[in-house]
Swiss-Prot record:
Keywords: Disulfide bond, Glycoprotein, Glycosidase, Hydrolase, Lectin, Secreted, Signal. It comes from Aspergillus flavus (strain ATCC 200026 / FGSC A1120 / IAM 13836 / NRRL 3357 / JCM 12722 / SRRC 167). Pfam families: Melibiase_2, Melibiase_C, Ricin_B_lectin. This is Probable alpha-galactosidase A. One of its GO terms (molecular function) is carbohydrate binding.
């Protein structure tokens, strides 16, 4: 088809021909101060998309409470375009699928109160075999601006190294180029990057870590790992959710206002999920302050699905201006306990039963970084009820269910010390301190694996709080706290935990060694609230 649209000259679509300072999104979080919420067709419909689907989805979201709850983005995924570009090099929509065109659809979506997003690929072809953006980045940016697009998901299929670059360097070049182009636009697009996902399933995670290092500099969110299971896919939908959940726990250090880790879509109508499992995905994503992008047949969502998807207390957690990602306070074979701070000074605790049996147990407040000498008010964010707690929270959970509590603190008990697991992200093993010895073991939920890190970088285990993690040469141990440099540690965006005295980095299996570059054995996850050196 011929392109029927109002063209905006590139000089107008971009800010100007004058030099423009390109700033990282994390330096200008006002572009996306909280994670995006909305709809994308891919996990539910894949390439079976058309104008009718998006009109009906828009109408349903405007009337069923989703728009009012904050889901204000309508995003197209792959397969919306023709297999060939126009003679002038521009992309064209498939006129059979979108007879009135994407500019018309964008206007319709916006007339209902939504923003409009689109999909492209950084390589020479999209994952579905349609034209990629490589070599056409500026004309595609111009096209999207003309169509009223304000959100771009840029995939990473069909990328091949050129000019002596490694594959990781090629991705950085392509996504960096898009970042420059988008940053110069009068109205910069929200930029969703899929680059990390293409490095997430290798045994050596150095390239994955490296890509994760640079994506916050270029965009507002990044798909860090494998796709969530699609509606027609084979396998367990719950296992797929758990895979993406676990990947998200590995990258908390990167998240901050203006940049969000993306564990992929909410698959709210997947037939393989129980209601508890659907609610768990939503609660975990909200606790992460992750994007809440629903991929489902919106007009047919049940009242039960709409009820949890519009839970205002959990949406408020997701949209909290701190954007702090919940991290692991404790983990064993059945329970994960996650914590984070909220902007109003309260503490969030999220408890996931990933085991196969129902569980009833107490969650001690000290593993959440709170004092056991204080009394707190804890609000159940599912039901809204409030209870007074001291020492612990009593919870009862069905298999694959998740509880979420907001714990209010008063002035006398407002201090929160970052507390939780220190774990190697490649092996999943937890740093464990017993008596004077320190090593790496399977996570078992014991207090010998739960650490507190104070503002000076001193680290102590909850099981023996008078003893601190100490480096001496290449050995580590628990020694009486004395505030010497061998007991002071710094945490970097690369995941390295570096000792101030030796200059060595914590290494999986026990001990410290010369700091490597993004090596599997030296990348660790730490509790939310620990200072991260950029």
């Amino acid at each position: 088809m011929r392109l029927i649209t109002r063209w905006i000259p590139l000089a107008n679509a971009l800010a100007s021909t004058m030099p423009v300072q390109v700033v990282a999104s994390i330096e200008n979080p006002s572009l996306l101060p909280t994670p995006p919420m909305g709809f994308n067709n891919w996990a539910r419909f894949m390439c079976d998309l058309n104008e009718t689907l998006f009109v009906e989805t828009t109408d349903a979201m405007a009337s069923n409470g989703l728009l009012e709850a904050g889901y204000n983005r309508i995003n197209l995924d792959d397969c919306w375009m023709n297999y060939d570009r126009a003679e002038n090099g521009s992309l064209e929509w498939n006129v059979t699928k979108f007879p009135r065109g994407l500019p018309w659809l964008g206007q319709y979506v916006k007339s209902k109160g939504f923003n409009f997003g689109i999909y492209e690929d950084s390589g020479n072809l999209t994952c579905g075999g349609y034209p990629g953006s490589e070599g056409y980045e500026e004309i595609d940016a111009e096209t999207f601006a003309a169509w009223g697009i304000d959100y771009l998901k840029l995939d990473g299929c069909n990328v091949y190294p050129k000019e002596g670059r490694t594959l990781q360097e090629e991705y950085k070049y392509l996504y960096g180029n898009w970042h420059e182009i988008l940053s110069k636009m009068q109205q910069p697009l929200i930029f969703s990057e899929s680059a990390p996902a293409y490095f997430s399933m290798t045994d050596n995670l150095t390239d994955w870590h490296t890509v994760m290092d640079w994506v916050p500099e270029y965009g507002e969110l990044a798909r860090h790992s494998v796709d969530i299971l699609v509606y027609s896919g084979e396998g367990s939908a719950w296992d797929s959710i758990m895979t993406n959940y676990k990947f998200n726990t590995l990258v908390a250090r990167y998240q901050r206002p203006g940049y969000y880790n993306d564990p992929d879509f909410l698959i709210a109508d997947h037939p393989g999920l129980s209601l508890d499992e659907k609610r768990s995905q939503f609660a975990l994503w909200a606790s992460f302050s992750a994007p809440l992008i629903i991929s489902a047949h919106i007009p047919d969502l049940s009242s039960e699905d709409l009820e949890y998807l519009t839970n205002q207390a959990l949406i408020a957690v997701d949209q909290d201006p701190l954007a702090q990602q919940a991290t692991l306070a404790s983990r064993d074979g059945s329970l994960d306990v996650l914590t984070r701070n909220l902007a109003d000074g309260s503490r969030l605790v999220t408890i996931l039963n990933h085991g196969s049996e129902s569980i009833e147990t107490d969650i001690s407040l000290d593993i959440l970084g709170l004092s056991t000498d204080c009394t707190y008010k804890a609000q159940d964010l599912w039901g809204g009820s409030t209870q007074t707690i001291k020492d612990a929270i009593r919870i009862k959970l069905n298999t694959h269910a998740t509880a979420v509590y907001k714990i209010d603190t008063d002035e006398k008990c407002s201090q929160v010390i970052p507390t939780g697991l220190i774990f190697n992200t490649a092996s999943g093993k937890c740093l464990t301190g017993t008596s004077s010895s320190v090593g790496s073991e399977s996570c078992n939920g014991s207090k010998s694996q739960i650490w507190q890190i104070d503002a000076s970088g001193v680290i102590r285990t909850l099981s023996e709080q008078s003893k601190c993690l100490t480096a001496d040469g290449k050995a580590i141990s628990l020694q009486e706290c004395s505030e010497n440099n061998g007991q002071k540690w710094s945490y970097a965006i690369t995941g390295n935990l570096k000792n101030a005295d030796t200059g060595y980095c914590l290494t999986n299996g026990g001990g410290v060694s010369a700091c490597g570059f993004e090596t599997n054995s030296q990348v660790f996850g730490l509790p939310a609230g620990v200072h991260v050196a950029l």
